[in-house]
Each structure stands twice: as structure tokens, then as C-alpha cells.
């Protein structure tokens, strides 16, 4: 079909503008994919653990309450409590605990004074004065070892992609 001797259609510039606008609309309108199958479970759990430890350190100082991060090494569950929680609140915290993915497990938790604990329940305390128990949390994902160093007075958690120990 022609109009005044020209072929009807869109120019390349018009098509590029329309595609760019559609791309921008999709970028801002689609929700972020939380359960992306391409994300590595060990990285997701590592970020969760690091974030949880940093949050508890900050909360202990801000709220002036002692917090405790509990690990059940046999079931791979992690939960938090604080000193002002009732028994019912503590039971709810255990029921709503974070469960590690099946392919990721906590091997042990190492303390400088107590040594390595590799079964049962282990607790790391976060005190209202701003310090915490010094500990190394060791995880294993297949043949990959991950270590998280929690320092008493340093807010950030150190992460190692190896099995680190206080004896090293």
C-alpha cells in the first residue's frame, strides 16, 4: 500500500524506541524473582547467615537486649531468641526457624575456648554491650567448604571459601 508514492511502515528508529520503552516498562513492572532456579543455594544461605549475624549484633546494641543465634547441627535449622522472649515466643521461634537447603549442611561450630562442636544444638550469644562470642561456623556444600568468622568487636563477618580453623 502506498501513500503519495511512499511505502507505508515504521522506520528503524521508531521500532528501536518502542522496543526500548517496552523493555523499560518490563524492567520496572516485573517483580524480582526470589526463587530463581539459577541462584546457588549455598550463596543464598551464606548471604542470609551473614545478614542475620550483622542484624543481631546491631539489634543487641540498639534494643539493649542479649540475643542468641541457635544452630541445630543435626537438622540444619537456625533461629534467634532474645532475653525478653517468653517460653511461647521461644517455641514459635524454633517452629519458624530457617532451614538450610538439603545439599548444604553445617559441619561444626568452633569456639576458641570450647573447641569444635559437631552435633546437637549450639548457641552464639550477642551481648547488649556490643560484643559477641568469637566463633567459626563451618558449612559444606558438596565438596566445597565455607567458613564464617564471627569476631567479638568487629561488626562484619569474615567469609572464607575453605575450611578455616583457629588453629591455622
Map each language-model feature to its residues.
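Hydrophobic alpha-helical segments, principally membrane-spanning helices and signal/leader peptides
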Residues: 14-16, 49, 113
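N-terminal helix-rich module
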Residues: 2-3, 28, 34-47, 58, ...
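Active-site-adjacent beta-strand anchor residues
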Residues: 15, 69-71
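Conserved catalytic core of two-component sensor histidine kinases
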Residues: 19, 43, 50
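N-terminal single-pass transmembrane signal-anchor helix
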Residues: 1-33
Amino acid at each position: 500500500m502506498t501513500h503519495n508514492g511512499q511505502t507505508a511502515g515504521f522506520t528503524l528508529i521508531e521500532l528501536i524506541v518502542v522496543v526500548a520503552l517496552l523493555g523499560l516498562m518490563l524492567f520496572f513492572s516485573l517483580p524480582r524473582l526470589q526463587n530463581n532456579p539459577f541462584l546457588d543455594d549455598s550463596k543464598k544461605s551464606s548471604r542470609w547467615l551473614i545478614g542475620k549475624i550483622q542484624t543481631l549484633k546491631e539489634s543487641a546494641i540498639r534494643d539493649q537486649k542479649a540475643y542468641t543465634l541457635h544452630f541445630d547441627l543435626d537438622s540444619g535449622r537456625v533461629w534467634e531468641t532474645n532475653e525478653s522472649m517468653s517460653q511461647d515466643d521461644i517455641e514459635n521461634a524454633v517452629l519458624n526457624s530457617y532451614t538450610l537447603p538439603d545439599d548444604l549442611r553445617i559441619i561444626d561450630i568452633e569456639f576458641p575456648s570450647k573447641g569444635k562442636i559437631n552435633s546437637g544444638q549450639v548457641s552464639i550469644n550477642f551481648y547488649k554491650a556490643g560484643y559477641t562470642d568469637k566463633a567459626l561456623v563451618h558449612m559444606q556444600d558438596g565438596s566445597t567448604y565455607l567458613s564464617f568468622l564471627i569476631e567479638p568487636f568487629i561488626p562484619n563477618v569474615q567469609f572464607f571459601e575453605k575450611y578455616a580453623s583457629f588453629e591455622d
